[in-house]
Amino acid sequence: MIEWSDRGIVLAARPHGEDGVIVSLLSAGHGRHSGIVRGGRGKRLRAALQPGSLVQATWKARLEDHLGSLVVELLAGVAGGLLDDRDRLAALAAACALAETVLPERAPQADVYDATLALLDALAEGGEGTPLVWAGAFVRWEIGLLAALGFGLDLSCCAVSGECGDLAYVSPRSGRAVGREAGAPWQARLLALPAFLLSPAEVPANAQAVGDGLRLSGYFLEGHVLAPQGRGLPASRQRFVERLRRWSAADR
């Protein structure tokens, strides 16, 4: 019998059999990992199996490549505190679905786990009046996810001139930053680089910048990570993006 215990973030749960649930976790030390939770459709475990819940999990299986079983205990829930804020709830659903879609199974992803915990904290703390803080955190989380998957963007210096100031674009081909002046002739072909990704402590995000950031990360997630596998971005992420477009419209 193989067994491990670890903390994990619930990414998804789907019914299995009469009362069971197949749960997908992003665990601290074992990466994205799935298992069957017996009785998972009952009221006792309902809160623990909501996407975004932090749980203590014990996984057991006879062989390493078996699906195995999971026993989970709720440590902290996030979704319940977001029920009155559909934007943050949409962000939570998008993050969990995206991690479930793009992360390889059973590959340790300690940095992604830590970054996802930080995102959940930002969502939990980001009530009315601070939406752009957590929305900016979501964009930075997606950029970090790209890096963890081997498709990190190089936002250090201009790919054309080599200068490291006034960066305004990203090349869709190379994923490298391009300066404002150097990129001006090809502006229509380049992706906008929001300034808050370069200096988050100095430049606050606004609605337009968040939208640009989501287009930037979404372009590379879809084109470089998912398209080669014949897949697209999760529908929940698209719904989240649509919700945030209302912010930009309200700012006009």
UniProtKB/Swiss-Prot annotation:
Keywords: DNA damage, DNA recombination, DNA repair. Gene3D superfamilies: Nucleic acid-binding proteins (2.40.50.140), Recombination protein O, C-terminal domain (1.20.1440.120). InterPro entries: ARFGAP/RecO, DNA_rep/recomb_RecO_N, NA-bd_OB-fold, RecO, RecO_C. It comes from the Bacteria. SUPFAM superfamilies: ArfGap/RecO-like zinc finger, Nucleic acid-binding proteins. GO terms for cellular component: bacterial nucleoid. Pfam families: RecO_C (PF02565), RecO_N (PF11967). Coiled coil: none annotated. One of its GO terms (biological process) is DNA recombination. Belongs to the RecO family. Involved in DNA repair and RecF pathway recombination. HAMAP family: RecO (MF_00201). This is DNA repair protein RecO. The gene is recO.
